[in-house]
Amino acid sequence: MVGLIETFRKNNNEKLKNDQDKEKNDREHLRQVRADRRERYTKAVEQLGDEKAPIRMGGVYTLVGLVDEWLEDESIEKYEDRLKEGQVIINNLCAYIRSPFNLASHYDELSKANPTPKGIYKGKKEKFYADKATLDSEADVRLGIIKEIHDRLQGPDKNTPGAWSDFEYDFSGSTFFYPIDFTNSYYAKPINFSGSTYTSWADFSGSTYKGWAYFNGSTYQRETNFDGSIYKGRADFSRSTYKGWAYFNGSTYKGRAVFSDSTYKGRAVFSDSTYKGWAYFNGSTYKGEAYFGGSTYKGRAVFSDSTYKGEAYFRNSTYQSKAIFNGSTYKGRTVFSNSTYTSWADFSESTYTSWAYFSGSTYKGEAYFRNSTYQSKAIFNGSTYKGRTVFIGSIFYSDVSFGENNENGSSSCFTKYTPNFYQKNYYQKTLFGSINNNFTVDNDKGHPIYLNPEGIPLKCKFLTLEQKEYLEGKFQEIEKINNKLFEVKDLKEKEELSKKLQALNEELHKWREEVTTV
């Protein structure tokens, strides 16, 4: 019996020693593995600064492989600790993308096959081809980084995370002198692309952003695509310039969406989107067509103080909170038809150069169209107004119609209140320039528009011949300046023309206030 006990004790001691030795060996192995990774990391970072592009590319692939190794290292129990190790390397890759590259400032010229007659490479063919090769090789290195990141931001199914989706990415202030493809990407953490410049096309469509997404203060020189994306946090695209077509349609914004103070030089498409938080588009300029139709705004929608130089479409939209369009200028055809406004809607202090359509819509709250100028026809046919509706202080230079809507065959209906074209308390009236108006509304279900013997709303007046001539002259001046703005390329001359245009608009605004004041 004593022998058995002694044998058992001896075996236990040997097992304990073996376990301790194994644990020690494992720790030593892990230490060596991690030391090896850090050594490879240091060498790879050094390679990123090498003059030769293939060596820089080798450093990129080493760093990418190290991130994968850290994430797959099950000897590190906590996933957060693995992420922490990987994030250090991600920060290096992002820093490389952010780093300036001098030749990128000549991208437009170096992207051509041969030197241009008027460029800085005129008469310098050898330097042109040498710089072009240098720029292209650096673009390949950076494209390699973007591709490796992009591949790991995509899950097996749509809108699912990839292996690298839990990292934070900071590309702020970058100049992307190569095409950007981040389609169908999934970001679980905040991302930052603010203050960036895209010299080629950029595609972020079909992506999901769980945290804040910063794209503000950026410039896109070619086509840009953010279609079909989901933003679960704040999305900031403010103070940006889009020189090519910009697509944001079919997207969902669950947090605040900010597109204010931006300029769109090509077509801008925001249609068929859903905004669950507040949406800001104020202070923006659209030089091409602007599409916002078929969208739903569950929070406040702010489009005030904007300029639309092309056609603007807002039809078939639903506004469940306040809709604010005041202080805007529409130079092309504008369509707000077949929309629903649950709260109050404000279109006041606006100017419509071409036809303006508000037909077939429902206004459940107050609707303000006051202090505005309608140069061409204004169509309000077949709409329902359940709250107070105010047109006072406006000028309808051409025809205005509240009659039957061609689509549903019904006239406009003011269910609770007679519309205000004259308001003694505000000392304002509305002026009309045409005799071909239609003020026929549904009197059975709502209130009439009371007319004077001249056939326009009570207490209102027709524009005098002198007033019409003044307006016609100002309209022609504005059109002339707008045409010049499209033709002129000199920035200083453009600035002077813009100042003249602003002064004319301010003069018209002041004049309208004076002539509509009782």
Provide a role label for each language-model segment.
Residues 28-30, 42-46, 52-57, 61-64, ...:
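N-terminal leader/targeting and pre-domain segments
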Residues 1-35, 39:
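Membrane-embedded hydrophobic alpha-helical segments
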